[in-house]
Regions:
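Metal-dependent polysaccharide deacetylase catalytic core of the NodB/CE4 family, i.e.
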Residues: 1-87, 91-104
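C-terminal domain-boundary segment and adjacent tail
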Residues: 111-137
């Protein structure tokens, strides 16, 4: 699994602050176990669904060995039935590139699929590098 980093996003994409401690444990650890059984990979980063978290949910996920990671850029790409135009998506993404960026692009987006190669090339041409979360301090 070299060069691949899996992050936890929970099993059912529920708002973390609305869940009990047992529900948070289940949402996180059920996915953790499934990924480990399938790939032999132990995840250590979590992105809370919808970016919703509380002190309680952060404390619980920390106790499970997770570090919470948020994003510094996202755009409306998640709705499969309302995809942005490719040209406007490229412009939006490229206009917001910055040092240390954690870019959130949803994998179910056909627009992202179609523009990702161009985006990566353009960002590299701007002098930026792509790094794993493990490489950041």
């Amino acid at each position: 699994m070299k060069d691949i980093l899996f992050g936890n996003h929970t099993v059912n994409h529920k708002s973390m602050p609305s869940l009990t401690e047992d529900q948070i444990n289940s949402e996180v650890m059920d996915l953790h176990k499934a990924i480990y059984e399938k790939f032999g990979y132990g995840m250590k980063y979590i992105r809370p669904p919808m970016g919703e978290f509380s002190e309680k949910s952060i404390s619980i996920t920390n106790s499970l060995g997770y570090k919470t990671v948020m994003w510094s850029f996202a755009y409306e790409d998640w709705n499969e039935n309302k995809q942005p135009e490719e040209s406007s998506a490229k412009k939006k993404i490229l206009d917001n590139v910055h040092n240390g960026e954690v870019m959130l692009l949803h994998g179910n987006s056909k627009t992202n699929t179609n523009v990702l190669d161009d985006i990566i090339k353009e960002i590299k041409n701007m002098g930026y590098e792509f790094k794993s979360l493990d490489e950041f301090k």
